[in-house]
Amino acid sequence: MERFLENAMYASRWLLAPVYFGLSLALIALALKFFQEIIHVLPNIFSMAESDLILVLLSLVDMTLVGGLLVMVMFSGYENFVSQLDISENKEKLNWLGKMDATSLKNKVAASIVAISSIHLLRVFMDAKNVPDNKLMWYVIIHLTFVLSAFVMGYLDRLTRHNH
């Protein structure tokens, strides 16, 4: 009975495979939205105010960071929790594949969230005259919470690695 339960639990990790594949579909949706924004801005580029262009560019950078986060979670999560990626030797392989454990993935995700939050906060500050003060305050508090969380996770990771 114990062996059956252990084998069933171990095999259940494959339930995550379609979830990681779903992230690739989310990446396609993000790419479509990215290019939709490019197509939308190009005809208007000469009539746009500089600040409006910067806001669009920050949105594109934001989407790019989210896309990188999706790729990182998709591949690292699959390799850490489901199975190793079997990529042939003659194909280009990302140098971090197979080297990122769950803890380093968590730290990279936290750093990415801080970067994404920073871009979002910058976009909000560029339009600060149209944002109520209490809402600005909450944006800053939420961003600082992300920063503090990422710092604490990195610090705790360093402590546990140092003690082992």
UniProtKB/Swiss-Prot annotation:
GO cellular component terms attached to this protein's record: plasma membrane
Pfam families: UPF0114 (PF03350)
Membrane topology summary: Multi-pass membrane protein
Membrane-spanning parts: 15-35, 53-73, 136-156
Keywords: Cell membrane, Membrane, Transmembrane, Transmembrane helix
Disulfide bridge positions per record: none
Cellular localization per UniProt: Cell membrane
InterPro entries the UniProt entry points to: UPF0114, UPF0114_bac
Principal location class: membrane
Family membership: Belongs to the UPF0114 family.
NCBIfam families: HI0507
Protein name: UPF0114 protein YqhA
Organism, as annotated: Escherichia coli O6:H1 (strain CFT073 / ATCC 700928 / UPEC)
